[in-house]
């Protein structure tokens, strides 16, 4: 009963002050509100007492105490999401839901990123473990993408700074925050190129529809699915893997790839100021979108010719 009342109080706060939160600092502010909730305090107290009872001379509980805040906050965020269900009545509700998902995923995402980095550096891994870590990362990336798309933040530095504030509130150490900065900067850059590509493609001649993909397609290397009608009236479904540079697209296409899936540069160039003079904007300029449309017209026709040629050889 008391637990239900605690959740209702949290939900009441968000429903009454959601507009203020949506215009405020977002992730850090909501993380702080969670840590101030009675449900969070109760869970944390129980876990800390359990750690204290389990501690021995050979086991220093301090290292575990630092982990408690982030996972308790993650659990509370998860429960609030379950309590809310599908209640996106207003844009502010959707933003709140995304930020709660962000806080829910964050400790698992950082752990997954660190493990994947160790695998790249030669640490032995089992294939199933690597797939599981990738699924966690992709799920988190999609939350970041949605937060950017909703316009909660306008600048990359603003979003990263707010996340760092949330991490500080949730007991992360300096080294963990530094690692998260590196991982998050990479994620944000990739997601803003995906969003920019989607915006430009929707305005490109011959493009009938553009769809963002689910986790399975993303893991298979498909970020966007495009319905395209070529210059001769032929209709095509094209899976695109959006890359932030021409070199990364070229390298991806030179590797083994399933047919019908194509890596392509987003067409947006930081050096040209497509994401602002300081490369800090999360959304591309209208001028850049207009320029990139012609780039996609050319690239989509190239992809179609390549696919037609491949089918003729069968």
Model-found features: residue ranges?
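Catalytic cores of nucleic-acid endonucleases
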Residues: 242-311
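A short, highly charged nucleic-acid-interacting micro-segment common to nuclease
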Residues: 25, 176-195, 213-217
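Charged, low-complexity, intrinsically disordered terminal regions
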Residues: 107, 130, 134-145, 155-167, ...
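Catalytic centers of nucleases
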Residues: 192-250
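Short basic alpha-helical hairpin corresponding to helix-turn-helix/winged-helix-like nucleic-acid-binding
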Residues: 158-182
């Amino acid at each position: 009963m008391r637990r239900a009342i605690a959740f209702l109080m949290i939900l009441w706060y968000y429903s009454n002050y959601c507009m203020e939160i949506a215009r405020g600092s977002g992730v850090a502010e909501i993380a702080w509100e969670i840590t101030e909730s009675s449900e969070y305090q109760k869970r944390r107290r129980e876990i800390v007492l359990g750690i204290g009872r389990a501690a021995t001379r050979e086991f220093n509980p301090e290292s575990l105490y630092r982990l408690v805040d982030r996972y308790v906050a993650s659990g509370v965020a998860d429960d609030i999401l379950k309590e809310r269900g599908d209640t996106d009545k207003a844009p502010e509700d959707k933003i709140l839901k995304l930020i709660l998902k962000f806080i829910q995923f964050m400790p698992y995402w950082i752990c997954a990123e660190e493990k994947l980095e160790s695998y790249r550096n030669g640490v032995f891994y089992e294939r199933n473990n690597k797939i599981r870590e990738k699924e966690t990362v992709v799920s988190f990336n999609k939350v970041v993408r949605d937060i950017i798309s909703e316009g909660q933040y306008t600048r990359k530095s603003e979003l990263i700074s707010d996340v760092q504030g949330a991490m500080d509130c949730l007991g992360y150490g300096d080294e963990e925050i530094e690692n998260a900065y590196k991982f998050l900067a990479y994620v944000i850059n990739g997601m803003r190129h995906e969003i920019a590509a989607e915006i430009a493609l929707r305005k490109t001649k011959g493009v009938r529809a553009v769809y963002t993909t689910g986790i399975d397609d993303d893991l298979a290397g498909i970020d966007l699915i495009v319905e395209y009608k070529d210059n001769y009236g032929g209709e095509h479904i094209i899976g695109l893997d959006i890359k932030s540079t021409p070199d990364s697209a070229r390298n991806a296409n030179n590797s083994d790839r399933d047919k019908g899936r194509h890596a392509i540069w987003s067409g947006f160039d930081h050096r040209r100021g497509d994401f602002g003079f300081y490369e800090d904007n999360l959304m591309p300029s209208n001028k850049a979108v207009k320029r990139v449309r012609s780039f996609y017209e050319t690239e989509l026709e190239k992809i179609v010719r390549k696919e037609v040629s491949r089918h003729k050889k069968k």
